[in-house]
């Protein structure tokens, strides 16, 4: 299967972010926050944003110039 270069290079970033989404949704559920109506979409959007932001902070991508030099 031919995946795009970006996905082959950054698969661990996406996997980590999706794992964080599940964890944050579990934390929100354990805290007892009960969302109704449009709030469910807002909570989902916020968990996605926070998860990808944290994944970007934790996982740093190497510079492409460094990769090409090796």
UniProtKB/Swiss-Prot annotation:
The keyword Nuclease does not apply. It is a multi-pass membrane protein. It is found in: Cell membrane. The keyword Transmembrane helix applies. Keywords: Cell membrane, Membrane, Transmembrane, Transmembrane helix. GO terms for cellular component: plasma membrane. It holds the Pfam family DUF2754. The chain crosses the membrane at residues 13-33, 39-59. It comes from the Bacteria. InterPro entries: Uncharacterised_YaiZ. This is Uncharacterized protein YaiZ.
């Amino acid at each position: 299967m031919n995946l795009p270069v970006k996905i082959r290079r950054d698969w661990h970033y996406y996997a980590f972010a999706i794992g964080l989404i599940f964890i944050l949704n579990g934390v929100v559920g354990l805290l007892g926050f009960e969302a109704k109506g449009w709030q469910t979409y807002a909570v989902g959007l916020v968990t996605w944003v926070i998860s990808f932001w944290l994944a970007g902070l934790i996982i740093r991508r190497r510079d492409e110039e460094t990769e090409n030099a090796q």
